[in-house]
Amino acid sequence: MKESLRLRLDQMVDRYEEVTALLSDPSVISDNNKFRELSVEHSDLMDITTLWQNYVGAEKDQADAEAMLKEASDPDMKEMMQEEIDSARDTIVEMEEALNLMMLPKDPNDKVPAFLEIRAGTGGDEAAIFSGDLFRMYQKFAQNQGWTLEILSANEGEHGGYKEIITRVSGNSVYGRLKFESGVHRVQRVPDTESQGRVHTSACTVAVMPEVEIDDTVDLNPADIRFDTFRSSGAGGQHVNTTDSAVRLTHIPTGTVVECQQERSQHKNRAQAMKMLISKIQQVKVQAQVDAADTIRRDLVGSGDRSERIRTYNFPQGRMTDHRINLTLYKLDSIMEGDLDEILDALLREHQADLMASIGGA
């Protein structure tokens, strides 16, 4: 292991011990914001500190066993010491790999809620129906994770599904788990309306954006935002509110448009829409930085161009293929029921491998 990494890990242990002591300080306990901030830091440091201490312990065990092996004359004792050395080496290799992963740069947005947008693309009615299928897939995945999913805006298709649906997903590490879902999702299947049994190809776009706090990171001039209201409508086009409580915000310089009709209160809808607008504009800034840096998310989210297909759902074959990592799974039924862990885990591993390669080449 590199000496610079050892030094950094030792510093993290020192900081962990410092934070542990601070959490017992009455002045910190009485300050809710400070206590919450330190508690999060303590939780973030705990696992890597424990693993590093175990790693150092395994190195000591190996060194002790090697010293005893040199002094041993009994064949049985030598064999036992060699087994201990081999075991310690294997443990050290495994823990070093884990430590390298844990030391990779973290996306500061990984733990925040996310806005999930699904839009029907090419394919007409079938694309809208598939948008509905994707929404239910993510909804079931969110339920399995213990997350909360709120529908902020929905434009239903004429024959089912959605032309567009925008949701907010909150819970533990939502954005970090879903961020690789952005892109074009293609479906191949026989529509219910197809009398000849021909397979049709349709597509939907998925966009996942972190919910960012409204602060100075995005400087918005109120004069650049057009504010419109309209009546929110529910399923089947029935009005669920007789007042103009739904809100549409348009950022004129960028042409960015967001809508929110979740709440009966216009004020609440406007506040939520402003968060969505901030997140969209922030995402454009982040994507520009990623494109300039070029490589880190090269195969995972691509350039952000919506013409880029990331995944195909082939219903006749029961197959899902993620084209970014050449992953094919023949369990489409369970995937559409929200079984996404195997896909998301594989995408995360590839992302981590890319990060390690970029750091190693730096």
Curated annotation (Swiss-Prot):
The modification N5-methylglutamine is found at Q238. Keywords: Cytoplasm, Methylation, Protein biosynthesis. Methylated by PrmC. Methylation increases the termination efficiency of RF1. InterPro entries: PCRF, Pep_chain_release_fac_I, Pep_chain_release_fac_I_sf, Prokaryotic/Mito_RF, RF-1. Its main location: cytoplasm. It comes from the Bacteria. Signal peptide: none annotated. It is found in: Cytoplasm. It holds the Pfam family PCRF. One of its GO terms (cellular component) is cytoplasm. Transmembrane segments: none annotated. GO terms for molecular function: translation release factor activity, codon specific. Peptide chain release factor 1 directs the termination of translation in response to the peptide chain termination codons UAG and UAA. Belongs to the prokaryotic/mitochondrial release factor family. This is Peptide chain release factor 1. The lineage of its organism: Bacteria, Pseudomonadati, Pseudomonadota, Gammaproteobacteria, Moraxellales.
